[in-house]
Amino acid sequence: MEASRNRSLVGNNRSPEMNENDGEDVAASAAVEDVEVWDTLSNGFKRAQLYLDQNRDLIQRVNENHMSRIPDNVSRNVGLINEINGNISQVMEIYSDLSLNFAKKFDQRRRTTKDGDTTTTTTGS
């Protein structure tokens, strides 16, 4: 322990060098960040897919109502189409949030790499 302390004190007068473990720490930190980014993307796409699947079912119902030519069924299409539009808005919001979060992470990673900073920060969704 004393030898490493002496080496450390001597090393303070030199320019900072990367410890052999620093590369591993940076790689581990980047891997954790990558997992977080992929999890965020995956969860967002799953949420969007739920709305898209619901829209597929709603569109099928609208088509069936239209084909039936029964006035009550056709009049129900107004509500169904409004629901479809609401779902499309939700999907757009999810994709917009994903895009923004991904761009922030990418920019953060770029700045971190450029500055040589190995610290990471997380952003809330």
Swiss-Prot record:
Cell location: Nucleus
MF GO annotations: protein homodimerization activity
Segments for region (Disordered): 1-28
InterPro entries: EARLY_FLOWERING_4, EARLY_FLOWERING_4_dom
Keywords from the UniProt entry: Biological rhythms, Nucleus
GO CC term, one of those recorded: nucleus
Sequence intervals crossing the membrane: none
Polar residues bias (residue ranges): 1-18
GO terms classed as biological process: positive regulation of circadian rhythm; rhythmic process
Role of this protein: Component of the central CCA1/LHY-TOC1 feedback loop in the circadian clock that promotes clock accuracy and is required for sustained rhythms in the absence of daily light/dark cycles.
Subunit structure: Homodimer.
The family this protein is said to belong to: Belongs to the EARLY FLOWERING 4 family.
Protein name per Swiss-Prot or TrEMBL: Protein ELF4-LIKE 1
Native source species: Arabidopsis thaliana (Mouse-ear cress)
Lineage: Eukaryota, Viridiplantae, Streptophyta, Embryophyta, Tracheophyta
